[in-house]
Structure formats: C-alpha cells, structure tokens
UniProtKB/Swiss-Prot annotation:
Belongs to the ABC transporter superfamily. Phosphate importer (TC 3.A.1.7) family. It is found in: Cell inner membrane. The complex is composed of two ATP-binding proteins (PstB), two transmembrane proteins (PstC and PstA) and a solute-binding protein (PstS). The lineage of its organism: Bacteria, Pseudomonadati, Pseudomonadota, Betaproteobacteria, Burkholderiales. Its main location: membrane. Residues 14-24 have a biased composition (Low complexity). This is Phosphate import ATP-binding protein PstB. Part of the ABC transporter complex PstSACB involved in phosphate import. Responsible for energy coupling to the transport system.
Length: 282
C-alpha cells in the first residue's frame, strides 16, 4: 500500500461489512446480520475520555477480534457490551449498544439477565472455589430450575462443548483449582456457555497459557462460532489472524479500521493499520 492510499475518499475506507467510523467521521455500514451495533459510543473513566465516538457492527455467528497497542481501548470496548463498568460509579458510557433492537446501555436493563445473554471469559482463569460440577451448575441455577438429571446433562453438554469433558468426567466432584491453567480456562468457557448466551466475550483468554493450551483454546473458538457470536481481545496478531473472521484495529480510544480479517492483514485500507500489523508501530 502506498502513501496515497491513506488519503482515499472516506466513503471507500470500509474494508468489510463495517468501516472505521471513528477514523472517517462517517457511520459504518452495518452488515445484514449484525448481532451488536455500536453507535456513537463514548466511554469515560472519571474525566478521562477512553473511547471516542465508536461506530461498529459485530456480525452474528462470526469471530471478531479487537487488536491494538496496550491502552488503546480494546478491553474497555469489550466490557461495555455486558456493562462490566456498572460496578464502578466513576465509569460511564454514552451512546448506544444495540442488540436485537434494544439499547444495552439503558440503566433499567437487568444486569444479571444481560450477562446471561452476553457471557465473558477473562484473561486469567477464574474458576470458582467449588467442584468442577458446581462451577458449571452455579450460573445455570440462577436462571433455570432443572432436575438433577437435566443438570447432569447440561454440565456434560457444556464441558463437551468446551472440549473438556473427556478430561474431567471422572473427577467432577474435585475442585476446579486442581486443573491445569489451560483446563481452568476451558472450564471458565464451559461455565460461560452453560447458561446458553447469545454472545461470548473473550478478554485475552490465552495470554496466561502455554502454546499447547493456547492451540486448544483457538480450536475451541473456531468451533464455538457455529453457536455463538464471539468477540475476542488479543495482543497476539497471529492469533487474531488465525481465529477471527473480522478484525477491528484501535488506537488511543478510536476505531481506526474494521473489516474482514484477511483484508485487514493482507491489504489494510489505512496506513496506521499497516504500520501496526507490520511492526513499524506499537
């Protein structure tokens, strides 16, 4: 890409189903099957303006990756989707995050129900201090009344979906703390999908794992997109290229470019994106 390409007509900067509205000043085109639509989103930590006029559409049934240097706002953006910031009164979001026609930022929305619809897995594995079985059953009991047989089936289903069942089926009564780091992360994924969310958020799920465990998580992500809309934050650009269908590049709280992952990595529309991907920046 030559220097002239960084000064293209803004209307031609979209590289996929949604362009970089923050970079062009225009509302990106929404994909026909958008699961989540972010409209003019701004986020503040007290007076610090962390996200600036983000416009973005998350395609349904796909894996979308957020990439960018540390502090660019990618994890902050991810956590607005299920209102993780609601625990902290000094943090606030303005704008719209729309899913199924409903603005998720509305204060009257039940937080527990929202987080049942939009599950989340964090950077560090966080098993509950209880048995493997109860780690899975705990969240389910909050939203459904199942018989013991039905719960057994749900636990097996979730652990199977997370590619963990065969490794733990004979020790379900044992503590989740006894599992390896990679197994604990898959347990957390199983716990997240056990309540059957529509969207699964993954905040750097492999950063604390060894290469073998990372490979298994990446394989799992590829399988999960057949049932869920997946959004992943990663510092690992190779991981984004391997796992995602769409990629958003962020810098200093702004969305610089968004599009199909292959196009973002092979022929980005913005020079800033190219500089980051090729290692000349960040």
């Amino acid at each position: 890409m030559n220097m002239a390409e960084s000064h293209l007509d803004p209307s031609k900067l979209a590289t996929g189903p949604a362009g970089a509205g923050a970079a062009t000043g225009q509302r990106p085109l929404a994909p026909l099957n958008a699961k989540i639509e972010v409209k003019n989103l701004n986020f503040f930590y007290n007076q610090f303006h962390a996200l600036k006029n983000i416009n973005l559409s998350i395609p349904e049934g796909k894996v979308t990756a957020f990439i960018g240097p540390s502090g660019c706002g990618k994890s902050t953006l991810l956590r607005t989707f299920n209102k993780m910031y609601a625990l902290y009164p000094e943090q606030r979001a303005e704008g719209e995050i729309v899913m199924d026609g409903e603005n998720l930022l509305q204060s009257k929305l039940d937080i527990s129900l929202l987080r049942a619809r939009i599950g989340m897995v964090f950077q560090k594995p966080t098993p509950f201090p209880m048995s493997i079985y109860d780690n899975i059953a705990f969240g389910v009991k909050m939203f459904e009344r199942l018989t013991r047989s039905e719960m057994d089936d749900r636990v097996e289903w979730a652990l199977t979906k997370a590619a963990l069942w065969n490794e733990v089926k004979d020790k379900l009564s044992q503590s989740g703390y006894g599992l390896s780091g990679g197994q604990q992360q898959r347990l957390c994924i199983a716990r997240g999908i056990a309540i059957r969310p529509e969207v699964l958020l993954l905040d750097e799920p492999c950063s604390a794992l060894d290469p073998i465990s990372t490979g298994r998580i990446e394989e799992l992500i590829a399988e999960l997109k057949s049932d869920y809309t997946v959004v992943i934050v990663t510092h690992n650009m190779q991981q984004a290229a391997r796992c995602s269908d769409y990629t958003a590049y962020m810098y200093l709280g702004e969305l610089i470019e968004f599009g199909e992952t292959e196009k973002i990595f092979i022929k980005p529309a913005r020079k800033e994106t190219e500089d980051y991907i090729t290692g000349r920046f960040g």
